[in-house]
Design a protein with these regions (language model features):
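Patatin-like phospholipase
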Residues: 1-39, 47-215
Length: 215
């Protein structure tokens, strides 16, 4: 195990299709980090990595876009969001549980892996950044619901409600898509960060329309 370096997956929506190969390569090379952090799309990478499912790690952001239930305008008009979030997270995991399909999630392997997990969501009502760990994920549904909450892109997905609280994409929180501060608070000084943005990228300030929508 790699105990002195935190593995951090940056969020980034479908840009995570490029970093899915990194997840698979880490698993293929037996690089087992003891602490794994992720936000938004990085939360999906986090749980796939901890479950040690190489094929699912690759397929989650590549093959899945071919799923007829993936989303689109029809899904948006039906109230499911442009990305059919419930189907993509809890739906697929529960429908394929116990099968040998590529997108089946091995929750037993996830629990058996001793690696610590840290993902974050953004409380839409309070503006609070909320962190979840394995203790908040006793079932696969609990886990997938939190991954979905961390990945809920405003305007593209309906808000995710957990215990009466409304959550949106964790990238809107204090970590800005990279759980570096959380890893530092956990005592880490060395980090293996899987980026979805090029080196030197700086997010531009929101324009007038987004500011009006999210104020």
């Amino acid at each position: 195990n790699i105990d002195d370096v935190a593995l951090i997956f940056e969020g980034g929506g479908m840009r995570a299709s490029y970093t899915a190969g990194v997840v698979a390569t880490l698993l293929e090379r037996g690089m087992d980090f003891s602490h794994v952090y992720g936000i938004s799309a990085g939360a999906s990478h986090t749980v796939n990595y901890v479950s040690r499912n190489i094929e699912r790690s690759r397929a989650s952001f590549t093959d899945l876009v071919c799923d007829p239930e993936f989303g689109g305008v029809g899904s948006l008009l039906a109230g499911r969001g442009f990305f059919n979030a419930h189907h993509l997270y809890e739906g697929i995991a529960e429908d394929l549980a116990g099968t040998d399909e590529i997108m089946a999630f091995d929750f037993d392997a996830f629990l058996a892996n001793k690696a610590e997990v840290h993902i974050e969501g953004f409380d839409w009502d309070t503006g609070e950044t909320v962190a979840w760990t394995k203790t908040d994920m006793p079932t696969m549904r609990d886990m997938m619901l939190r991954v979905r909450a961390s990945s809920t892109m405003p305007l593209f997905m309906p808000p995710t409600v957990i215990d009466g609280r409304t959550f949106m994409d964790g990238g809107m929180g204090t970590s800005w898509g990279i759980c570096l501060d959380a890893a530092r608070r956990d005592g880490f000084e060395r980090f293996f960060i899987v980026r979805t943005q090029p080196r030197g990228y700086r997010k531009k300030p929101l324009g007038a329309l987004p500011r009006a929508v999210f104020r």
